[in-house]
Amino acid sequence: MSLLCRNKGCGQHFDPNTNLPDSCCHHPGVPIFHDALKGWSCCRKRTVDFSEFLNIKGCTMGPHCAEKLPEAPQPEGPATSSSLQEQKPLNVIPKSAETLRRERPKSELPLKLLPLNISQALEMALEQKELDQEPGAGLDSLIRTGSSCQNPGCDAVYQGPESDATPCTYHPGAPRFHEGMKSWSCCGIQTLDFGAFLAQPGCRVGRHDWGKQLPASCRHDWHQTDSLVVVTVYGQIPLPAFNWVKASQTELHVHIVFDGNRVFQAQMKLWGVINVEQSSVFLMPSRVEISLVKADPGSWAQLEHPDALAKKARAGVVLEMDEEESDDSDDDLSWTEEEEEEEAMGE
């Protein structure tokens, strides 16, 4: 008769007749989850990946046990500072917007790159991805020689890495066509000839775009402890070579490239203040976790500052109005001669 072992970290089936004192390799301790790290109280190994945590090999040998283990009793006696920090509930009242405004740094500090930590599981996934690629595929497949810059108004052609050193002069706006006139929304030069319209020099200088990256609508959320905020972006196989996360004490800028050249980008003004030097990023096969250490312990009412959320909401309304105007075209906003005559007769 085969029974299921209930020891933590084992989960194997065993025969009671052959159950020896050293048949089971398990964890006698309890799971610990603290500051995005996961592990067992009985051994020192820690990981940020939950699947790696489940696969941590047991640290103690003993017999298999088919009975469900009782819940571990709470330790008696004085608790250590670390255990208090782990068990301390988030019972701090969120600070008001006025308090946050007074305490926020007055000057905008420059953004700093946060260190990237690559999990072992992601390293293995990237190695397997490289093995599965056809010969000649890889980074060179993302940018091919002879590729044209995709920015409107720029006619540069990719010849190699040195092409990135040349400036890109382009139009950041959208083309407009109204009553035979052609122009760009970012500059006011109008022309009748389509060839002259295409030949208009760009009005902004930036970096070349050799291949449009697909914007990824990734699911993302956040959670917090008393001393930490963790922003999680979900996506398959983040590519470390193309990823960066920058932060200041009050801002967070995220640029994550996943497999398939899909890109997640976000800019946030944070609710509270963080310690940039102690913050970091963890890359895993199915997600990216951004761990932000709070400058002061306490609870955040939300991830982003209310002023930033209000500004985004207003920008969303403006964008929606712009899209409606572009759908209706500019003709709806102009008067024809017949309409002017009808208006005059009506008066």
Swiss-Prot record:
GO-annotated biological processes: centrosome duplication; muscle organ development; signal transduction
SUPFAM superfamilies: HSP20-like chaperones (SSF49764)
Domain CS, first and last residues per copy: 215-304
InterPro entries linked to this entry: CHORD_dom (IPR007051), CHRD1 (IPR039790), CS_dom (IPR007052), HSP20-like_chaperone (IPR008978)
Motif extent (SH2-binding): 158-161, 234-237
One term under GO cellular component: Z disc
Tissue specificity statement from the Swiss-Prot or TrEMBL entry: Expressed in skeletal and cardiac muscles but not in other tissues.
Short sequence motif named SH3-binding, residue ranges: 28-31, 70-78, 172-175
Keyword tRNA-binding: no
Domain CHORD span(s) in chain numbering: 5-64, 149-208
UniProt region (Disordered), positions on chain: 319-347
Pfam families documented for this protein: CHORD, CS
Binding residue positions for Zn(2+) 1: C5, C10, C24, H64
Source superkingdom: Eukaryota
Molecular function, one GO term: integrin binding
Positions annotated to bind Zn(2+) 4: H171, C186, C187, C203
Task of the protein: May play a role during maturation and/or organization of muscles cells.
Domain notes: The tail domain binds to the cytoplasmic domain of both integrin beta-1a and beta-1d isoforms. The presence of Ca(2+) ions does not prevent binding of a fragment consisting of the second cysteine rich repeat and the tail domain but prevents the binding of the full-length protein.
Record's subunit section: Interacts with beta-1 integrin subunit. This interaction is regulated by divalent cations, and it occurs only in absence of calcium.
PANTHER family for the chain: CYSTEINE AND HISTIDINE-RICH DOMAIN-CONTAINING PROTEIN 1, INTEGRIN SUBUNIT BETA 1 BINDING PROTEIN 2
Name this protein carries in UniProt: Integrin beta-1-binding protein 2
Organism: Homo sapiens (Human)
Primary gene name: ITGB1BP2
